[in-house]
């Protein structure tokens, strides 16, 4: 991005105002500077590198090193500078001016998730500084402003993505575009449907070979479904498998992947060393199990519970200790099902194993009139949109006095993302008539620390935040 001499001068004045080198921080100086610069069409995402403001060789070196990694560096923006420079001894009046400066930048397109040369978002910078101060300090207010903006942004983007055909076409283009789009959608849908069907067929085949009963839509499957295919398809599939995919983001590829339980049964990993589940989650699972039975009728024969995603079986083991009258477990991966069979889960009294994806197995429960005192969701390779789709089933299957929860790892690799999605979940649950509160569970420092040994051999740390927010969702 290049700027004229006049634009560069304006950009530098913006960064100077956001650095708060002059006190007091006032509307007629600091805030007015931001407003004037924005009105001159200087982007709110302008960076120090755009203006050649690197102060030393070390900063430039760090940027080069990070760019060579697996994240995209944007640069130090005015928001970063506000978060790093706002004085901790600021008055209430100065704080309000700084917050207005941030709001002004957000109105002009400033990004809450842009990364500086150290790979930090503005929220990361503010959080690190506020940790050293009291949580109710002025620095915490700066951090909370970032979280509020991030929440608004994510909710807005979700609404846009849910909208259909957000395009403006001329009458001449409309018909042609519709035809092209339909053909492209049919092709894409066909590919995705084929992948899903193949993954389901593979899972059913392995489950049947292991002697398991397979139930889909409430009916027992006697034969493995046959799919149309030929040797050329198999050859193409083998070739595609050689290209590494993101197993954490692709359910079809995940269901085809070989999973491994470590010898000590403390970790379940993919062939890419993704941590599907790890035993550091034990305390979280214990308290989640306690939660799931907390609202059950004490005069009944025992709670009726559902867990989606078996993993290491931690939460299901705790649930068994609660003496449930009915205990449903939904699991789709053939390697996990094999482990469950080996460990005797298929023969436990009151346990019903739903073999397959929850999208395929839970609808059958709706027609059977099953209601749960507690429902838990903890899947791998699914996205937030899948969790929101699961809310539909919660509404239909949760007893009026029941409680729903899930493994809340949304954005847990950054505190600011974790806090933003904590709020986003609340907004989405409200649309389904569900209320949510959070119980805070402290996570062991061996997990959150920079040198956490529990991550040895794991491809990517999926948890860095200090507190786990356990969702308590009720009608």
From Swiss-Prot:
One of its GO terms (biological process) is methylation. One of its GO terms (molecular function) is protein arginine N5-methyltransferase activity. S-adenosyl-L-methionine binds at residues 254, 285, 310-315, 331-333, 358-359, 378. GO terms for cellular component: cytoplasm; nucleus. Keywords: Cytoplasm, Methyltransferase, Nucleus, S-adenosyl-L-methionine, Transferase. It is found in: Cytoplasm; Nucleus. Residues 247-475 form the RMT2 domain. Gene3D superfamilies: Vaccinia Virus protein VP39. PROSITE patterns: SAM_RMT2. Residues 169-194 have a biased composition (Acidic residues). Its EC number is 2.1.1.-. It comes from the Eukaryota. Its main location: cytoplasm. Residues 167-194 are annotated as: Disordered. S-adenosyl-L-methionine-dependent protein-arginine N-methyltransferase that methylates the delta-nitrogen atom of arginine residues to form N5-methylarginine (type IV) in target proteins. Monomethylates ribosomal protein L12. Belongs to the class I-like SAM-binding methyltransferase superfamily. RMT2 methyltransferase family. Monomer. This is Protein arginine N-methyltransferase 2. The gene is RMT2.
